[in-house]
Amino acid sequence: TLIYACLKLGAVIVVADTGLGLKGLTRALKGANPQFIVGIPAALAAARSLLWPGQRISAEPLNAFQERLLGVSGSVFAVAQKNQTGTVDFPAPAPGADAAVLYTSGSTGPAKGVVYTQRQLAGMRDAIAHTYGFEEGSALVAGFAPFALLGPALGATSVTPKMDVT
């Protein structure tokens, strides 16, 4: 849900996962210089100790002690609780606007950030919808990580088994 909210806002998401290792994650995040890092407590602990840039926000509710320990300024949960009263309309991002930075595996050298535009992500979504006949209300059980992310974007009711996507 957070990824889709960021894309709708026009925020550029940077996806770097643990498969890069601490050295690779540090290189990726320092290179991307994000304004915010949203993560689970283990990722936030790494962000604090490795001096990753960006304001730290927890993906899980934390108590006050945990927030201070991790240097967290809030949680996604707290923001969602504050804004339950209504919706906010944002202008749609331009099709050519940057949407995401996804990192290569690093199997042939250091992982590299690949920038995708709003148009490219929409094109991938539309190609999969057309190829597999997805429409709003379709059902999807995703065993392949990219399809797990695309399911909700396709309007499909999605179930994703617990899996390690790295």
Regions found by a protein language model. Name each.
Residues 5, 28, 148-151:
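Hydrophobic/aromatic ligand-binding patch that stacks against planar heteroaromatic rings
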Residues 11-12, 122-139, 145-166:
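Conserved AMP-binding/adenylation subdomain of ANL enzymes
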Residues 12, 18-21, 59-65, 163-166:
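Short, acidic/turn-prone active-site loops that include or flank metal/cofactor-
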Residues 80-103, 110, 120, 133-139:
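Conserved pre-ATP/AMP-binding loop-to-beta segment of ANL
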